[in-house]
Amino acid sequence: MEITDNHFHLDPSGRKELAVKDFIKAGGTRLVLVHKPYGTWKKIDSFQSQVKTTLKLAVRAREAGAKVAVVAAPHPIELLKLLEFNSPSQASEIYFEAVDYCTSLVEEKKTVGLGELGRPHFEVEPPVWDLANEVLTESLSRAKEVDAAAVLHTESATPEVMADLS
């Protein structure tokens, strides 16, 4: 039987393949490696560099013996960080550049999907919430265009939130 962790993070300054070996020792066989931010990025090249780090970590996880699928996308919190330095339209544009980079990785078969896409899991001002919803909707549309899986990051998993997302 395959034992899968469907939301596994690795950090380049963390335990890396040692964490994967612990997972395998516990009976795990497969994992979905979900990209996470390794620091604030303001431009697309910094984001791409971080995703390339995730892809390298996936290679190390495979070398440790796990079957690995990778998902990558700009984390929802990154939109808020981009808003600190940019107008809403500029922040959205940079965010979508990152989404498009991630969809290209799906097309190149380097990843299986986009993740984590979503919304802040804490309260934000209504205009920011609205922008996060617009960005999420468009990001999911772009994921659908390349038949990519989507890993969602949401504020909770209540029936109300699920209805709002559908």
Which ranges hold each PLM region?
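Mid-domain alpha/beta scaffold segments of enzyme catalytic cores
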Residues: 1-166
